[in-house]
UniProtKB/Swiss-Prot annotation:
Listed cofactors: heme
GO molecular function, one term: heme binding
Alphabetically ordered keywords of this record: Heme, Iron, Membrane, Metal-binding, Monooxygenase, Oxidoreductase, Transmembrane, Transmembrane helix
Name listed for the protein in its UniProt record: Cytochrome P450 71B22
Subcellular localization(s) per the UniProt record: Membrane
EC number(s) reported in the record: 1.14.-.-
Gene3D superfamilies: Cytochrome P450
PANTHER family, per database record: CYTOCHROME P450 71B11-RELATED, CYTOCHROME P450 71B22
Chief place of localization: membrane
Domain of life: Eukaryota
């Protein structure tokens, strides 16, 4: 039976359901008129953040939509975001239950997608203590510095012959190696079961499916279940999850080998010890699903986001030679000539690099839509009534391009942050690459250190040029991705060893 026939047969039921579901009182935010059953889904393209941005130009900073029968509010300005993330942080800090997030979080036993409550708080505390604390950040400094040397050595081989470099692959390998050594105790350069190209494919496939649309989440009465299976979405989602879970099991099994040693204590070892001792975190027993849930968060969020940010930064620098020249001159003047190695002590000296990264976050947030929230009670945002159980999407892409916040918002101009109090740490709602409030990214400090150190190395040791015959206007800026948004076309540049 065709999908269209299912729609026709179930249409009367859905009309009744949709009418009952729609809030009937109070001043709701404005929004485009939806259709029965599908709501506003027909008005959304592949790029969800751009679709939201375009609609918000007509319907305002707080916009009401329906994904099928699920009410959704899209927030597109600093002021509205502050109301959600600060004023109503507690009432909006749980997550909607979605098919993909349930699967990849091992039934919400992670940190990023877990429902708000005591279990989530205890898991977050564990991750902060064992992975993201300031003590751990300092202790793992040697890993980040070692991997930055590996990156420089790889690029040097290409620079000697002026061979074009795919910076996507180079920077992904850098971030993946660091994150997996920090979190998993695994040095991928020495693992016999890890192929970096396959790891990259695994991350991209998992993130694509994590951000995929499941009709089951938004259509009632079993229709979504049927469509997901007819379309193949259900099968594709579960195959991707199985491949990721199999990789995690390899890492866990490697930890369990007799006599296996890591170069430091990692969260996998800590949680395995808790599982073996039947220890509790708060009120619950730690299980392998909790372990894999944390691994999923760290692996998918930590590996790709840093690489994406560095790629966009290098892309904008290639498009703006003035900024590139100014940045490299500052770096080399401050750090001096012929420095053999960059250390994290150098990061505090290079102020303009931080401005470039902030401007990159503004124009190219790795996750343009923060992880969705869900209201746990009725509340008001910008004077509009927001019913309980409404999904909230915060569009940092729109906020970063709001002319009320930013002069000439579409221009790449790091100087806009000179003497500006605005930072990315969750206290300024016009710049939210890591979110804010209770659900702010716990790995923020680690993530930004990885990005700063990687960029500092590639900009200090090498001069960069476009391939022969390519002009600045030829650089493709098209985006790709759902959960995180990367540069679709690889950034290929030619490195040259800097002549002192």
């Amino acid at each position: 039976m065709s999908i269209s026939l299912y729609f026709l047969l179930l249409l009367p039921l859905f009309l009744i359901f949709f009418k009952k579901l729609s809030p009937s009182k109070g001043k709701l935010p404005p929004g485009p008129l939806g259709l029965p059953i599908i709501g506003n889904l027909h008005q959304l393209g592949k790029s969800l953040h751009r679709s939201f941005h375009k609609l918000s130009q007509n319907y305002g900073p707080v916009m009401f939509l329906h994904f099928g029968v699920v009410p959704v509010v899209v927030v597109s300005t600093r002021e509205a975001a502050e109301e959600v993330l600060k004023t109503h942080d507690l009432e909006t800090c749980t997550r909607p239950k979605l098919t993909a997030t349930k699967l990849f979080s091992y039934n919400y036993k992670d940190i990023g997608f877990a429902q708000y409550g005591d279990d989530w708080r205890e898991m977050r505390k564990l991750a902060m203590l064992e992975l993201f604390s300031s003590k751990k950040l300092k202790a793992f400094r040697y890993i980040r510095e070692e991997e930055s040397e590996v990156l420089v050595n790889k690029l040097s081989k290409s620079a000697e012959t002026r061979t074009m470099v795919d910076l996507r692959k180079a920077l992904f390998s850098y971030t993946a190696s660091i994150v997996c050594r920090l979190a998993f105790g695994q040095n991928f350069h020495e693992c016999d079961f890890v192929d970096m190209d396959k790891v990259e494919d695994l991350v991209l496939e998992s993130e694509t499916n994590l951000g995929s649309f499941a009709f089951t989440d938004f259509f009632p009465a079993g229709l979504g279940w049927v469509i997901d299976r007819i379309s193949g979405q259900h099968s594709e989602l579960h195959k991707a999850f199985a491949r990721l879970s199999n990789f995690f099991q390899h890492v866990i099994d490697d930890h369990l080998k007799p006599g296996q040693s890591q170069d430091h204590s990692d969260i996998i070892g800590v949680m395995l010890d808790m599982i073996n001792k039947e220890s509790k975190v708060g009120s619950f027993q730690v299980t392998y699903d909790h372990l894999k849930g944390v691994m999923s968060d760290v692996f998918l969020a930590g590996v790709n986001a840093g690489a994406i940010t560095m790629i966009w930064a290098m892309t904008e620098l290639a498009r703006h030679p003035r900024v590139m020249k100014k940045l490299q001159q500052e770096i080399r003047e401050i750090l001096g000539d012929n420095k053999e190695k960059i250390t994290e002590q150098d990061l505090e000296k290079v102020h303009y690099l931080k401005l470039v990264i902030e401007e990159t976050f503004r124009l190219h947030p790795p996750a343009p839509l923060l992880l969705p929230r869900e209201t746990m009670s009725d509340l008001k945002i910008q004077g509009y009534n927001i019913p309980k159980n409404t999904m909230i999407e915060i569009n940092t892409y729109s906020i970063g391009r709001d002319p009320n916040c930013w002069e000439n918002p579409n221009d790449f101009n790091p100087e806009r942050f000179i003497d500006s109090p605005v930072e990315y740490k969750g206290q300024h709602y016009e710049l939210l690459p890591f979110g804010a409030g209770r659900r702010i990214c716990p790995g923020m400090a680690t993530g930004i250190t990885i990005v700063e150190l990687g960029l500092l190395n590639v900009l200090y040791f090498f001069d960069w040029s476009l391939p022969d015959g390519m002009k600045i206007e030829d650089i493709d800026m098209e985006e790709a991705g759902a959960f995180v948004v990367a540069k679709k076309v690889p950034l290929e540049l030619i490195p040259t060893p800097h002549q002192w």
